[in-house]
């Protein structure tokens, strides 16, 4: 049960939350001016049929949507987790579009005080989608407010202090909470267990990424050769968000070079090399870490704190941002003694193999 300041009188309405982004699924299809204001939104698919990849996820959610609409109920609460950039926010907007309702978008760090989340909940319309990004960062008080809201569609509030305190239970309309996180393990068990659908988003394969790049190129009115499309897909780390970002950088170079026809693989290579993205998708930070390990420490093992100090980076940044893709490629290995460059990592940077290398 949460305590709300007695300054917020019930008769004067619910306290106002911090501004949240509201996406009206029906209006979004017709309002091209609003779409062009946000480039990322302009490249997002809006229906499940347009959403490329994540086939198992689409199948599960498609069945859940049809069942909920057939019963005339709100969709069950959904938790989406996985690495950043794979389409969790996009999927929340797609769900709202399929259900024909509004999607209210906010993030956990914006919900600092009880009144922030109370204001959001009491202003929800029936069957609306409430999307909370980085939901693992919710405060304990915010989580406790969500428990009865998710389970019983009820908001339990204690208004006032001391002898004047009184308890109020506010009925909420049926709604769908969609939570997104890159750290599902950081969610408390009571919160995680209240989601009816818990789904992981996986990295995308080459074929799906090529389809995503080709679709985005069409929306940006670019002509890409199949080879150029495949090259961008190879360098985007299996992540649509990065693929779209690289495509825009290619568009910039094509614009400056005044390329009027089809963009070929040579121009793609020129553009991505300019931004120091190599053939495997490694950027300058990735290569700097590997080169430091090889040049200064013979390939490792080296502790995380030592690496961070030498690179001038925060250890958390290295562990959460730089290392995951190197581990995924098999270029880096975490051992009890520290980080080690593998034989594959040596080969990519052109270093000779060493008998002591990790396989």
Curated annotation (Swiss-Prot):
Its EC number is 3.6.4.-. Belongs to the RuvB family. ATP binds at residues 43-44, 85, 88-90, 194, 204, 241. Coiled coil: none annotated. It comes from the Bacteria. Residues 1-22 are annotated as: Disordered. Has 3 domains, the large (RuvB-L) and small ATPase (RuvB-S) domains and the C-terminal head (RuvB-H) domain. The head domain binds DNA, while the ATPase domains jointly bind ATP, ADP or are empty depending on the state of the subunit in the translocation cycle. During a single DNA translocation step the structure of each domain remains the same, but their relative positions change. Keywords: ATP-binding, Cytoplasm, DNA damage, DNA recombination, DNA repair, DNA-binding, Hydrolase, Nucleotide-binding. The RuvA-RuvB-RuvC complex processes Holliday junction (HJ) DNA during genetic recombination and DNA repair, while the RuvA-RuvB complex plays an important role in the rescue of blocked DNA replication forks via replication fork reversal (RFR). RuvA specifically binds to HJ cruciform DNA, conferring on it an open structure. The RuvB hexamer acts as an ATP-dependent pump, pulling dsDNA into and through the RuvAB complex. RuvB forms 2 homohexamers on either side of HJ DNA bound by 1 or 2 RuvA tetramers; 4 subunits per hexamer contact DNA at a time. It catalyses: ATP + H2O = ADP + phosphate + H(+). Gene3D superfamilies: 1.10.8.60, P-loop containing nucleotide triphosphate hydrolases, Winged helix-like DNA-binding domain superfamily/Winged helix DNA-binding domain. PANTHER family: HOLLIDAY JUNCTION BRANCH MIGRATION COMPLEX SUBUNIT RUVB, PTHR42848. Residues 279-359 are annotated as: Head domain (RuvB-H). This is Holliday junction branch migration complex subunit RuvB. The keyword Transferase does not apply.
């Amino acid at each position: 049960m949460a305590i709300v300041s007695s300054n917020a009188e019930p008769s004067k309405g619910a306290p106002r939350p911090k501004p949240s982004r509201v996406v009206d699924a029906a209006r979004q299809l017709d309002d091209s001016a609003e779409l062009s204001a946000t480039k990322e939104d302009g490249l997002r698919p809006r229906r499940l049929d347009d959403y490329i990849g994540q086939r198992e996820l689409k199948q599960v959610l498609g069945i859940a949507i049809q069942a909920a609409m057939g019963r005339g109920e709100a969709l069950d609460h959904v938790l989406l987790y996985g690495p950043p950039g794979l389409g969790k926010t996009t999927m929340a907007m797609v769900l709202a579009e399929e259900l024909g309702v509004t999607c209210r978008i906010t993030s956990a760090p914006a919900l600092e005080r009880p009144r922030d989340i109370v204001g959001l909940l009491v202003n929800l319309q029936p069957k609306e989608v409430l999307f909370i990004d980085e939901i693992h960062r919710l405060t304990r008080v915010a989580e406790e407010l969500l428990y009865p809201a998710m389970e019983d569609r009820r908001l339990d509030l204690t208004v006032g202090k001391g002898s004047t305190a009184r308890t109020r239970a506010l009925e909420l309309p049926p709604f769908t909470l969609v939570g997104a996180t890159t750290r599902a393990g950081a969610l408390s068990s009571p919160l995680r267990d209240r989601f009816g659908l818990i789904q992981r988003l996986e990295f995308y394969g080459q074929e799906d990424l090529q389809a995503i790049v080709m679709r985005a190129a069409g929306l940006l009115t670019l002509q890409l050769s199949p080879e150029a499309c495949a090259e961008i897909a190879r360098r985007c780390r299996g992540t649509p968000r990065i693929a779209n970002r690289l495509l825009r950088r290619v568009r910039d170079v094509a614009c400056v070079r005044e390329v009027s026809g089809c963009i070929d693989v040579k121009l793609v290579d020129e553009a991505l090399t300019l931004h120091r993205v190599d053939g495997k998708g490694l950027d300058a930070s990735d290569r700097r870490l590997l080169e430091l390990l090889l040049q200064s420490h013979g390939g490792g093992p080296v502790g995380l704190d030592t690496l961070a100090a030498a690179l001038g980076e925060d250890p958390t940044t290295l562990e959460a941002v730089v290392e995951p893709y190197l581990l995924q490629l098999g270029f880096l290995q975490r051992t009890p003694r520290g980080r080690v460059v593998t034989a594959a990592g040596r080969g990519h940077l052109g270093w000779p193999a060493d008998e002591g290398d990790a396989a």
